[in-house]
Amino acid sequence: MRTSNSKKHLGHTARKRFGQNFLSDMNVIHNIVAAINPRNEDFLLEIGPGLGALTEPVAEQVEKLTVIELDRDLAERLRHHPFLHHKLTVIEQDALRFNFRDYFDSLNLNHHQAIRIFGNLPYNISTPLMFHLFKFHDLIQDMHFMLQKEVVKRLCAAPNSKAYGRLTIMAQYYCQVIPVLEVPPTAFKPAPKVDSAVVRLMPYKTLPYPVKDVYWLNRVTTHAFNQRRKTLRNALSTLFTAQQLEMLGINLTDRAENLTISDYARLANWLCDNPPAIDTNQEILYDEL
């Protein structure tokens, strides 16, 4: 079967199962690299380097760059890059399953060396990948990611807005979230059907709303936003009684998007000390975040 030329870029056919859309607009690439501002003294790691649109200009500014690439053909291509192969450490693995803590520990990095992560993430795994990376927030100085524009809106959202959801709360619990630039579909080959945007995530050194156990923050936000059209009295009924919510300063007629991160942290800490007898084990659905 012939492959459409629109799906082929620099001799490589984009694979739908990997969510591959290759960045090709040089002006956009320049702006992203400028936002990353790579420094030789940093430990830089790229997720999903693809055909090297960001890899090459970043590697030109530093002596070493580590990349994680699942596509074996692209990983092999990077290992034999004509002028950067000696700078690159290529890890051929799924970033969703990669233990960043074990890897960084194995390198015996200087305690003061900043770990900085960037990438043009496949949109089909971007949300679960960010949740995976949040587990290692204490190791990371910053992250720059190309994402679907709608996802960036959710990351940056404020309470009382439609975009505000569980992804918003968990991202802003761990990180300061800063939108960087918007990117049109024409900047990619093949062009995606959605607009894109670049976001900067800067993990807090000290969490502004610490919780005793993040499990309970996950649980309360999952319950609230999986039923976001319901009042909190009903959405959180398996976790709290109406009297308990009122005691914690929650308006029973409010909905999930009306609470701040501080409110959710307060609820999570109360649950940690007073776990419910029955907690419905609701599956976390990333496409509903």
UniProtKB/Swiss-Prot annotation:
Residue ranges spanning the membrane: these are none
What does the entry list under GO cellular component?
cytosol
Q: What is its main location?
A: cytoplasm
What keywords appear on the UniProt entry? Cytoplasm, Methyltransferase, RNA-binding, rRNA processing, S-adenosyl-L-methionine, Transferase
As one GO molecular function, the record gives:
RNA binding
Cite the InterPro entries for this sequence.
Answer: KsgA/Erm, rRNA_Ade_diMease-like_C, rRNA_Ade_Mease_Trfase_CS, rRNA_Ade_methylase_Trfase_N, rRNA_adenine_dimethylase, SAM-dependent_MTases_sf
> Which annotated residues bind S-adenosyl-L-methionine?
21, 23, 48, 69, 94, 120
Location comes to: Cytoplasm
- Reaction(s) this enzyme catalyzes, per UniProt: adenosine(1518)/adenosine(1519) in 16S rRNA + 4 S-adenosyl-L-methionine = N(6)-dimethyladenosine(1518)/N(6)-dimethyladenosine(1519) in 16S rRNA + 4 S-adenosyl-L-homocysteine + 4 H(+)
Has UniProt tagged this entry with the keyword Chaperone?
Answer: no
Q: Return the EC number.
A: 2.1.1.182
Its job: Specifically dimethylates two adjacent adenosines (A1518 and A1519) in the loop of a conserved hairpin near the 3'-end of 16S rRNA in the 30S particle. May play a critical role in biogenesis of 30S subunits.
PANTHER family cross-referenced by the UniProt entry: DIMETHYLADENOSINE TRANSFERASE (PTHR11727), DIMETHYLADENOSINE TRANSFERASE-RELATED (PTHR11727:SF7)
Stated family: Belongs to the class I-like SAM-binding methyltransferase superfamily. rRNA adenine N(6)-methyltransferase family. RsmA subfamily.
Q: What is the protein's name according to its record?
A: Ribosomal RNA small subunit methyltransferase A
* Phylogenetic lineage: Bacteria, Pseudomonadati, Pseudomonadota, Gammaproteobacteria, Pasteurellales
